[in-house]
Amino acid sequence: MEMETDEGINSLKARIETQHKSHMYMLSSVQSVIPNFVSSLDLSLKVLSSFNHRPFAPTPPLTNFNPPKSSSLQQLPQKPSVKTLKTSLVVTTNPVLEKVTPLSVVLSMVAVCLLSRLPFMEIDSSTLWRKLENDETFTPQDKAAFQELAGDSGGPTLAVEIALRSMADDNGAVELEEFAVSGKSRIMVLNIDRTRLLRQLPETAQHQLQQQQDELSLGDGNMNQNQQQIAKCSMNLEDVDALINKKSFREMQKYETAKELLKIIQTPSIREAAVAAKFKTKGGSQMRPYCDLPTKEDCRRRTGSFIACNKLHFRRIIALHTDINLGDCPFLRTCRHMNTCKYVHYEEDPTPDLPPTMMCAPPPPLKPLKQQRAEYCSEAELGQPQWINCDIRNFRMDILGKFGVIMADPPWDIHMELPYGTMADDEMRTLNVPALQTHGLIFLWVTGRAMELGRECLERWGYKCVEEIIWVKTNQLQRIIRTGRTGHWLNHSKEHCLVGIKGSPEVNRNIDTNVIVSEVRETSRKPDEMYAMMERISPGTRKVELFARMHNTHAGWMSLGNQLSGVRLVDEGLRARFKAAYPDVEVQPASPSRASAMELDSSVAAQTTTSAMM
């Protein structure tokens, strides 16, 4: 019994070996006519193996396969000549089989490598080339195809990138993104479309080859059956991939629910809308944009029209001493020698483009620009401006009370000629700033040299430096300043403001930016946008400015400095404390009547109640 079993096993092995040699001989015969046939077949089998999660064994080299001595081969019809086979291939106009280009080889290999990544994860072109190079089926002929496609200008990675771009351009089979690594451009494959990527495989060529084999009677029935199964599986892969990618009903429900939740989250609530409206400028924005071209003539010349745009323009001031060949004045509006400067200066141009007699209809009246205010709320809400002309170094800060916001623009000693006096570093350190604040913010303007000194002063006064605001300076024509009056080595086109915090103040966070782009004006005058920013950050609190001038006085602010006009106090308690400390100093205005003060308080209360009801 055991003898019969061994004989059956040996007989089966012999039949398998004979069948294997028969198949290899037929493959070798076809390979001699169509060089790319075996590699295309291996690629298709590798794709099927990856989808079925089965190991893949490549076809061994077809070098010395002799025809097996089997009755099955003897029954085969006579093999036609090579000339007849080539003639039949030419008749069948198949570009894939007529000419195998290096691009088609690289496209097939890259497509197989991308399809074998289950699930798909992002991969870059260099990593993709390494995976192809380390594959056991990678032959020297394949490497030669990569080198031929890349040419002398690049390596195999360039060939991979050429194939990826070809896939993306032809049918959008891959989603690509370029990035740079060490100065070299690389491609990242973000996602793939398996249905479209399968079209890069030579399935059509295999199908036509099978038809030609049937006509030429090459191969036995088993091989034709295998080819038919491969083609059928390849055609069904698209349907399977589409079915896998299709979302289920539960996934669709989750997607719709998430979409509705996102819409609800992004919609501002009534409270958020009210808070946003609170910080809008009362009466609407008063801003009028400037045109990119300075004059109306330049604007008309660019547009080819007789009428310039509605934006603000300038007109050149040409005096008797002006030399147009010198160009624009570096300082423009801030020039200190306007009467003798030979450069060109500018002023705003309010004149209409055409006289009224030439216009069919009267032009719309220009909206009058109100005086620009830094505050976003009314004077009644803020209160009246107050100031004290004093020497801040020895002034009694304790009589002023506590403030929520402090802004200071000290006259730092920057070792340059300035039109005002400066303070020594030790005098800055010993200022009695801590008496003005327990909980709040301080905004300290510093120069380049005083940057670290300002941080030291903040720490000495009890503050923690948390932010830094940058003011980018522009000139009258809204261009970046290139010839500033400050700077030892380079012209300074910006200034810095250190922001310190003390205690636990109640402030509005993340409602403003740390960069301000604004036009320069008088010496040491800071942009008015600072006052609006501080009012938004800490609304309704008392605010004081140190080292102020008359142009710095604002509603709701207390200003201290030695260049102010006398003393103006409207707060009764503050007037009393100041009179007690400095009885010989005259205070303006005359002591306001209690009725006027009560009217001011009642108006503020009424506006507060109205806004609360809204």
UniProtKB/Swiss-Prot annotation:
Free-text function comment from the UniProt entry: Putative N6-methyltransferase that methylates adenosine residues of some mRNAs. N6-methyladenosine (m6A), which is present at internal sites of some mRNAs, may play a role in the efficiency of mRNA splicing, transport or translation.
Pfam families recorded: MT-A70
The protein's Enzyme Commission number: 2.1.1.348
GO cellular component, one term: nucleus
Catalytic activity, as annotated: an adenosine in mRNA + S-adenosyl-L-methionine = an N(6)-methyladenosine in mRNA + S-adenosyl-L-homocysteine + H(+)
Statement: the UniProt record of this protein carries the keyword RNA-binding: yes
PROSITE patterns found in the cross-reference section: MT_A70
Chain spans, region Positively charged region required for RNA-binding: 479-492
MF terms in GO: mRNA m(6)A methyltransferase activity; RNA binding
Region (Disordered): 59-78, 589-614
Protein known as: Putative N(6)-adenosine-methyltransferase MT-A70-like
UniProt binding sites for S-adenosyl-L-methionine: D391, I392, D409, K526, R549, M550, H551, N552, N562, Q563
Presence of keyword S-adenosyl-L-methionine: yes
Keywords linked to the UniProt accession: Methyltransferase, Nucleus, RNA-binding, S-adenosyl-L-methionine, Transferase
Family: Belongs to the MT-A70-like family.
Record GO biological process: methylation
Low complexity bias: start-end ranges: 67-78
Species of the source: Medicago truncatula
Subcellular location: Nucleus
Comp. bias regions, Polar residues: 604-614
